[in-house]
Structure formats: structure tokens, C-alpha cells
Amino acid sequence: MINVIDSMCGSGKSTKMFKMMQESYGKNPNKRFLYVTPFLSEIDERVPKELPSMNFKTPENKGSGKLSSLCDLVTKGDNIATTHVLFSVLTSEIVDQIIKMQYVLVIDEAIGCVGLLNNELKKSDTTALLKSNMVFVDEE
């Protein structure tokens, strides 16, 4: 299921997402999260401050690079915070591993990420997703 939260800038969307993650994790600490944001400050400052019990890890630019580090974190089942840039270059193998490990994907400021699918999704695909309730728009 995809839950889209759309609202004015500064209306508390990120805060709402953080609260939803914290509540979900509180109910099931085995749940895994992949949080994607365009802002390094969110990863470096806000995530550790607001979600300390979830122990989010960040891909590091060591050894084989950030993409390899992300793959390692997914394989270990860590909660992960990363950027849109790194998310945009995921390989199909990493995506398969994310699915296999049953990650909850949370994309903040998702316009750029969703744009990656524009060449693959047709209007009829979007309509079918909405009608099947696999995607919905949160009116809050």
C-alpha cells in the first residue's frame, strides 16, 4: 500500500511521518524502515534527534562507496536514512533485497523520486493503482 501525504510546505508532513514511523516501530520493533529525504541535515540531525530508539544508519562513502554501504545495511536489516540522490541509483538487486527484507519505504519530499517512474507509468497505470486502493491520497 502507498500512503501519500500532501500538504503545504511547513504544515508538519515530516513530523507526521516521523510520528507514524515511531508508532509503528513501537508496536513492532522488528519492522524495518528506509527513510529517503533530499536533505542531509534531516539524516544527520533530525532523524537521530526525533527517532533515537530506531537507531537509523546512514550509508557511508567508504570502501566500495555509498551504494555498496546501502546494500550492506539493507542485508543486515538496519533502519536506514538516505538521500533522494542515492535512492535514485538503486540497482534492481538492492530493490529486490529491500522487498525481501520487507522494508517500509518512507519518502519525504517525494516529487523527484516519483519522477523517476514517469517514463514507465502510464495514466492508466496511475488510475488502476488508485482504483485498486493500492495508492491513495491522504486528505489531511
Q: Where do the language-model regions lie?
A:
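Pre-Walker A adenine-sensing motif
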Residues: 1
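Inter-Walker segment of RecA-like/P-loop motor cores
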Residues: 51-90
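Helicase motor interdomain insertion/brace
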Residues: 8, 13, 76, 138-140
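Loop/turn-to-beta-strand initiation segments
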Residues: 32, 76-80, 101-104
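Conserved Walker A/P-loop ATP-binding site and its immediately adjacent core
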Residues: 9, 15-60, 85-87
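Signature of the SF2 helicase/ATPase Hel1-core->accessory helical subdomain module
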Residues: 87-140
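Hydrophobic anchor at the beta1->P-loop junction of P-loop NTPases
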Residues: 5
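Conserved catalytic network of the ASCE P-loop NTPase/AAA+ motor domain
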Residues: 26-28, 71-74, 96-99
